[in-house]
Amino acid sequence: MSVTIDAQLAQSFGLTGEEYDKLVTIMGRTPSFTELGIFSVMWSEHCSYKSSRIHLKTLPTKAPWVIHGPGENAGVVDIGEGLAAVFKMESHNHPSFIEPYQGAATGVGGILRDVFTMGARPVANLNALRFGDPKHAGTRRIVDGVVRGVGGYGNCVGVPTVGGEVNFHKAYDGNPLVNAMTVGVAKQDKIFLSAAAGVGNPVVYVGSKTGRDGIHGATMSSAEFDEEAASKRPTVQVGDPFIEKLLIEACLELMATDAIVAIQDMGAAGLTSSAVEMAGKGGVGIELNLDAVPQREPNMSAYEMMLSESQERMLMVLKPERTEVARAIFAKWELDFAVIGELTDTGRITIRHKGEVEADIPLAPLADEAPVYNRPTVPLKAPARIETPADPEGIEKALLTLVGCPDLASRAWVWNQYDGSVGGNTARRPGAADAAVVRVEGTRLGLALTTDCTPRYCQADPKTGGAQAVAEAWRNITATGATPLAVTDNLNFGNPERPEIMAQFADAIKGMGDACRALDFPVVSGNVSLYNETRSPSGEAQAILPTPAIGALGVLADASKSIGLAMPDAHDLVLVGGIRGELGQSLWLREICQREDGAPPVVDLAVERRNGDFVRSQIGAGAVAACHDIADGGLLVTVAEMVMASGVGCTLEAAPTDVAAHAFWFGEDQGCYVIATSDGAALVAAAEKANVLAMRLGRSGGTDLELPGTVRVSAERLREINAAFFPRFMGEGA
């Protein structure tokens, strides 16, 4: 290929001038076109974590129940009975803006592979979706494509989609977020890792053929968007969930033998990343013969094959004597199987194609010795706490506005496009509890699963917002009765080269770390997505809200004893936790007063821990019939959601006089729960003994939510208003 290799070409590949000079020094010569491509993807933000790595190292990652933390394809935790949960969350933001259906679908496919490559059968998918303002011209198209893509892939591959989030804000108009999470279950003694070993062992390619889709997808995901984003459609991968299903079954069948030495999926940067990471982790070299790579298109170059991000592909190192056993399994499942290389003792990656050496690079500079930056930050000014605004329209009208607003409206339109029950092990479906609950087949165990983040809090105060995201995930797991075990994160931010954005990232990590340590909630896997910005024709950069999405997992000894939102008739409602009436950054402030200001609610991690441990103990003692944590919309929205979930009404008592009524009912105070119990007095007494604030709120019964003299609205009316937004926004039958 007669192309001049220089700093200008390297810059078009996403490398800086300094990085190009560094790679020339490493190579001792000008790189080939293929070598330049390999460096550009491995040193991209998406693959190298060069701006985030120093901050990520501060997060707590260890606990007695953690089997494998960050560094593998997914995190692994002990759930008892010799079993492990394997889970991770990952973004597909940039592709989902360019091509919403395929971007979202292949995001699901990629995270599934991260989990089953470790020997786990996937048992659940979740997703955290952030879209632009519903009034923005492009939002409806992106919502439609993303939701269909998530459902289309997950449904076909036979893994239930059991939970997640959907939020709207104008900051995502040009840059939606699609964060996908998969959870699998494996035997603890059957976990497969990615470190290659055994000089001379064969390197095997399995799955789909390689095409030209997705080339430079990793570098695209490491840059801002502009008005020409649509021209990048060729960098979006195209997925086939039916092939993925075959690949899952073939890999799990092979894993039941003793053939596999190491295994890695081909994700970002495709064959390049999988080969470099496997050999690098194992401290060996690797030689590839691209003539043997199964190709979907004719005349593919070495550069194209190494950088293609075609989906449904895996790379394995096998024991030589078991190669034919493996070949037979993949032939049975009608998948490609090719020996494309072997491990060496050189510490280098050598790539041959049509008799020529196309690349010969030392491995260390591509992986562990990739550039790492301690980017500059600026101090962020914490917003002042706001004075409680006057109530402009009354409690009942505000309640109806809130339950119908885009961020609180029923997500049934979304969930109904997902198969949430395939496999028959979903114990708590979306909307039925604060976290989804999935039974672990062959046991009584249950996994509680959630995703959480409140980006408007993070925008106002990234440290508090980071802590709150972790605390809310812990609280949602707790509300089901499960013991919270661990976290996977998906850190979505703007351009790290802007000091104010890097400060948001660093502060959010500090808050997350504080919360994880206080709650014994280690981070075992995750993903960083930077450069989530759109540049307008005038050159102005619009960053997303800082969005450190948290995926969390907990375990129940008995899935059948999980707790949901639906409250029975004739039960006391008890508030656990103290209400200050925190209206800063609340949905009430935004939807009723059209303001987005003030400090987010205080996150007191000691109180969070004490209250949550108390709630879990009461659930374990059989004293709790329903439980829901206070989050978006505040206390009255929490109660309304319990009314809508059950169809049972309730009568509430007046708010305490030391807090304005609207602040009491709509403040988004943290560390609080509403519990339905048969004996409210006993639960309040137990709380006092545990040094936990608690008070009786009222009693369930009838079909209306009633606050005497202030609110009287039927469960049916609440449901009607709550259900209206999505069908109206998307169009009936959309």
Curated annotation (Swiss-Prot):
Hydrolase found in the keyword field: no
InterPro entries tied to this protein: PRibForGlyAmidine_synth_PurL, PurL_linker, PurM-like_C_dom, PurM-like_C_sf, PurM-like_N, PurM-like_N_sf
Instruction: Name the EC number(s).
Output: 6.3.5.3
User: This chain belongs to which protein, by name?
Assistant: Phosphoribosylformylglycinamidine synthase subunit PurL
Q: In which pathway does it act?
A: Purine metabolism; IMP biosynthesis via de novo pathway; 5-amino-1-(5-phospho-D-ribosyl)imidazole from N(2)-formyl-N(1)-(5-phospho-D-ribosyl)glycinamide: step 1/2
Q: State whether keyword Cytoplasm applies.
A: yes
Q: Which organism is it from?
A: Gluconobacter oxydans (strain 621H) (Gluconobacter suboxydans)
Cellular component, GO annotation = cytoplasm
